[in-house]
Amino acid sequence: MQKLGFPAMKSFDQLRSLPGSAKTYFFSTRPPQDSVSSGSFSNLKLTAEKLVKDQAAMRTDLELANCKLKKSMEHVYALEEKLQSAFNENAKLRVRQKEDEKLWRGLESKFSSTKTLCDQLTETLQHLASQVQDAEKDKGFFETKFNTSSEAINSLNQQMRDMSLRLDAAKEEITSRDKELEELKLEKQHKEMFYQTERCGTASLIEKKDAVITELETTAAERKLKIEKLNSQLEKLHLELTTKEDEVIHLVSIQEKLEKEKTNVQLSSDELFEKLVRSEQEVKKLDELVHYLIAELTELDKKNLTFKEKFDKLSGLYDTHFMLLRKDRDLASDRAQRSFDQLQGELFRVAAEKEALESSGNELSEKIVELQNDKESLISQLSGVRCSASQTIDKLEFEAKGLVLKNAETESVISKLKEEIDTLLESVRTSEDKKKELSIKLSSLEIESKDKYEKLQADAQRQVGELETLQKESESHQLQADLLAKEVNQLQTIIEEKGHLILQCNENEKNINQQIIKDKELLATAETKLAEAKKQYDLMLESKQLELSRHLKELSQRNDQAINEIRRKYDVEKHEIINSEKDKVEKIIKELSTKYDKGLSDCKEESKRQLLTIQEEHSSRILNIREEHESKELNLKAKYDQELRQNQIQAENELKERITALKSEHDAQLKAFKCQYEDDCKKLQEELDLQRKKEERQRALVQLQWKVMSDNPPEEQEVNSNKDYSHSSVKVKESRLGGNKRSEHITESPFVKAKVTSVSNILKEATNPKHHSKVTHREYEVETNNGRIPKRRKTRQTTMFQEPQRRSTRLTPKLMTPTIIAKETAMADHPHSANIGDLFSEGSLNPYADDPYAFD
């Protein structure tokens, strides 16, 4: 408060440090007239209590004043808080300025980061140039590989075409003969046998379809893995091409072997055809043995019912499996489309970054497509040749075995014919399975050689085609099932007819037994003929094997010479292509470096221009911010100064008003206390006059007593009456205690002095205490009930309160009146005199009988 310019608060703070000083006024210790009998000290105590109550009331007033002061101090504290808020705002503005500086530093760091980015871009461009060089080198290497492979494949194509023509001719001959054999067999066999063959065919088809489904699932899983491995497989293509060349050479050798085997097979087929003609003649004789099959027909009827139930179950399973295949196809197509979309996005990015390499990539892709098409055609031709050869070989082997068994076991001709039919069907199945396996292998080779996009599209198309074929096959199987159901009905009618024929067969059994005897003789002759034919056939095979081994050796030597010549040509062409492509790559690199240098120079110029513009804008913004900040600081300071001045003026006015009010109240209270003090002083003076009169009376009475008690003249007693009060009291005490040593201590004690002193001297001593050294106007001392003595010192400007003194443990001395002194002296001088006591017991001689103020 004093720092803010409130000098008037000093006096008021001093008032706060003096509790109870506002109403401590000076009073005399003279008792009023009404309480003269109880003593002056009791009255003084009552007045002191009143003063204490007045002090308490004054304290409450001072507390109210203190509360008001606290409120004013709170107002001042609020002003100080406003000052602090203003300082905080200034600090915030400084913080904002620092933040702007940090932003500027951040912009500078961004500019430095842009420079580093430019440097990184230059490095990346250099890296791309190096990658372009590597790609062009790889391109040249692949072109050389493809050229060599194309030449080799063309030569192989020519050879394969020749082989295909020969194989087609052989196929036509074999098919014609097979058709003739099948027609003969179909004519011989009954409808029941046809039903069995169809049943086996349907079972085999179902098994094949199950195998195809499993293979499709495996191929789908493999394709997913292959899509992920395409990038790695592209790098390994050049290694695979070399391996495939070796495989092609191996296939050529196999084709030559097949041609030799084909000639051998043709010779053997001619011989077997002759044998089949003979066997057919024998089979015609055995047509009458059909009655043995009647018992088997009953069993077939039972099997037919079980087959129907199983067929229904299989059809249901096939439908569910077909639905699962469709779902798998949809999922595979969705995944393929997603991967295709991702690959397309990657390709667009790469195309945007490498526009210069698009032309070269397109050329390479076209060449690769052409090579792949050529390769596919070769593989398809080879697969067809393999399939046809395997079919013919298997069929011929099984037929030869069947014929040998027929010739060896003529007794059970019918059962052996059934077994031969089953073996032929199994051979057909195995040949078809081999075909499918070879086709799957060829398709996998084709898929591996194609690019990412072509593989995905080809897989999708193949899956669609396979599903369509499966659907068609399922429809055809359903039609076949309907036909089989119709045939079953027909067979039932036939069975009824056969019941009638059984009776006829029983009659014909006798005739057949006779014919069997004749057939046995014919079989013995046939066995001898077959043994001779086997020997001749073995000799032919050994001779043909020797010729084939010689021919294979010659072919291997020729192939080795051709391969060495092809390698020499390939190396020469490779060196030429590498040199030409190196020149092209160097030219392209020079052009790209010039373009990139120009682009970098342009980017640097633009970045410099942008830096200059941004620096100018930043400097202008900083100037504007500083001007705004200075204007805000000036406005805030002016507002703050005005508020401080207004608050100071208000506080000073309030303090002045309060001080004037307190001074007026204090003056009025002082005047009232002065009036009371004057009245009390007058009363005390009257009491003093009365006490003086009493003392005079007492002195007269004492003189009379001394006259009676001693022989001393009355004049000396009157003179020494005031002086000998203490000596008489000392004598009385010495007589009671019985010692002279205590007399000296009693004369020096303060109690004796108190006895000698009068009431006027006591009042003078009370009005002049020796506690304070500096007294400006007046000091008063009043005794309260608690024994505390509050003192008030009045100065010119301030009033201070002293802490009350603690009550002493000593007993207050009693004032010695003349009667008490006389009693003590009488007891001391005449301790054992009874006559003197009798004098005071009489009413005429007692001087205090009529005195109401005398002490007992």
Swiss-Prot record:
Residues 78-193, 332-598, 635-705 form a coiled coil. Residues 719-729 have a biased composition (Polar residues). One of its GO terms (biological process) is reciprocal meiotic recombination. Keywords: Cell cycle, Cell division, Coiled coil, Meiosis, Nucleus. One of its GO terms (cellular component) is synaptonemal complex. It is found in: Nucleus. Residues 711-743, 826-856 are annotated as: Disordered. The keyword Nucleus applies. The keyword Nucleus applies. Residues 731-743 have a biased composition (Basic and acidic residues). Required for chromosome synapsis and normal fidelity of crossing over. This is Synaptonemal complex protein 2. It comes from Arabidopsis thaliana (Mouse-ear cress). The lineage of its organism: Eukaryota, Viridiplantae, Streptophyta, Embryophyta, Tracheophyta.
